[in-house]
From Swiss-Prot:
Alpha-L-arabinofuranose binds at residues 27, 72, 172, 244, 292, 349. Belongs to the glycosyl hydrolase 51 family. Its EC number is 3.2.1.55. Pfam families: Alpha-L-AF_C. InterPro entries: Alpha-L-AF_C, Glyco_hydro_b, Glycoside_hydrolase_SF. It comes from Bacillus subtilis (strain 168). It catalyses: Hydrolysis of terminal non-reducing alpha-L-arabinofuranoside residues in alpha-L-arabinosides; (20S)-ginsenoside Rc + H2O = L-arabinofuranose + (20S)-ginsenoside Rd. Optimum temperature is 50 degrees Celsius. Optimum temperature is 35 degrees Celsius (at pH 4.5 with pNP-Araf as substrate). Homohexamer; trimer of dimers. At a concentration of 5 mM, K(+), Cu(2+) and Ni(2+) exhibit inhibitory effects on the activity. Additionally, the chemical reagent SDS also displays a certain degree of inhibition. Enzymatic activity is largely unaffected by product feedback inhibition. Keywords: Carbohydrate metabolism, Cytoplasm, Glycosidase, Hydrolase. This is Intracellular exo-alpha-(1->5)-L-arabinofuranosidase 1.
Amino acid sequence: MKKARMIVDKEYKIGEVDKRIYGSFIEHMGRAVYEGIYEPDHPEADEDGFRKDVQSLIKELQVPIIRYPGGNFLSGYNWEDGVGPVENRPRRLDLAWQTTETNEVGTNEFLSWAKKVNTEVNMAVNLGTRGIDAARNLVEYCNHPKGSYWSDLRRSHGYEQPYGIKTWCLGNEMDGPWQIGHKTADEYGRLAAETAKVMKWVDPSIELVACGSSNSGMPTFIDWEAKVLEHTYEHVDYISLHTYYGNRDNNLPNYLARSMDLDHFIKSVAATCDYVKAKTRSKKTINLSLDEWNVWYHSNEADKKVEPWITARPILEDIYNFEDALLVGSLLITMLQHADRVKIACLAQLVNVIAPIMTEKGGEAWRQPIFYPYMHASVYGRGESLKPLISSPKYDCSDFTDVPYVDAAVVYSEEEETLTIFAVNKAEDQMETEISLRGFESYQIAEHIVLEHQDIKATNQHNRKNVVPHSNGSSSVSENGLTAHFTPLSWNVIRLKKQS
């Protein structure tokens, strides 16, 4: 048995948790939309063709915001194709994912569906093949009440009330050579600045996300962020980060240490934002939108064999295992540790495509192992992020040194009078953890949720639910706080409630 210590103090404040860090992403890609959220012939389809069983699972996650419609798809998308009578909409080749897009689901259908699952939409505008004009028209179509061409067109389509979308993305991964309309940092920065300016003239209340690097391994990483922000700093509110992790080498200790890479990534981009703030003598602070993150590697080879140019092309259908859930938990913890700067995050994606939810055409929908840490954080991680002081045994691995076996984040809700400790034990031994609580003397343990499994590669399928959490965690109140026993390789959620 290993031992660790943790101090949780009410005054060790990181910042308020923006609920949007528990966001997700749905792209017109694979079976995310068609055969995912939308399947008119399914027994569970509602009057609009959207699957009610999928809606129920999304509601369990309490997803606050969903990025839409892409993704690489975005850079070749004409939003006008997806509005108006469905029978008049064109079928287009989506060059990003080699599919045929029917445009059955477009802006109004998706925004109406979002209301059904109680979420907001983070709408993205195409800065690949389109630009300023298409972007400002989309804002007018979505957000202007009436009396103009585009707002009245929306009303003529049967949607009288404006949507009031508050969060918008200025393109997608424009630094990537694979992107339709790929640009240099200066080219993108100028276009993004002018587009942002005009979009905010249409609706001054909106917030805008500029494209950061596609990932931290890009050769122009950091230089891209600095140049883009020098053009856009006074016109945007966030810059994006995208990152995915995998365990191709089947090296578990190294894989679980990847949360340290995310920590470094966040710090690097935040520092770059602050450098540009100083350079431009600005008084505003640009925060971060981690609007694509997840585990992604299981499906890579299988995707090469899928027939091109069909609709609902089954690609990126990663089947996640228990070790993936542990890393997703650690990545969520890392975001909470940076709640002062990370204000938006989107688990990419939500249904079928590298997703916590999987569906069968005409059949069931089910929860993958990564569903659970994401749900726990979203449901219980609302409030103020506190900085726990952790003394834990450490280990070295291929790419990292001094990796703590215990990774933890703490969220305090003054309104709900709850304290929630999220912790991952990365050790293959039980971890006895003494937790000192300062300022929470009247709090008692309400629940200790654990996600664990003897087989690190265990998966869930529609007929086999192997990886599910339980509430039989071992923790007890001690003289100065509590003692928690974290089982080997486990995700833990300890919920405490103030006693009257």
